[in-house]
């Protein structure tokens, strides 16, 4: 089985899913969350920073995976905040907005693949450290 980064890249690059959906489906596959195409429709609108360059869809997808895994924990909101900080640091950007992240990381041929793969890497490490 592929790791989280490979799964996310496959969904994003090979299957053409948006950033949020790619992370969600990769997380579902790797962590056995039982989510499918119908569930993924909930995150379609988060791609491209909700279509206006706002909050990064890869971050939104990551938070959704964390929610499925950890939402019953009392410290869930704190965990989310910690992941957002890790995401910012990992992508070396002072913002979580798609527009700013894309300006820094997007490439003409691969679009935001680098952001999606990095988000998946960060998410995998974060889950392992907080499980």
Predicted segments — roles?
Residues 6-15, 45-54, 104-109:
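A short glycine/serine-rich beta->alpha loop
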Residues 77, 81-131:
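C-terminal binding/interaction regions
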Residues 31-41, 67-81:
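Phosphate-handling active-site elements
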Residues 1-31:
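Active-site-proximal helix-loop elements at catalytic-domain edges
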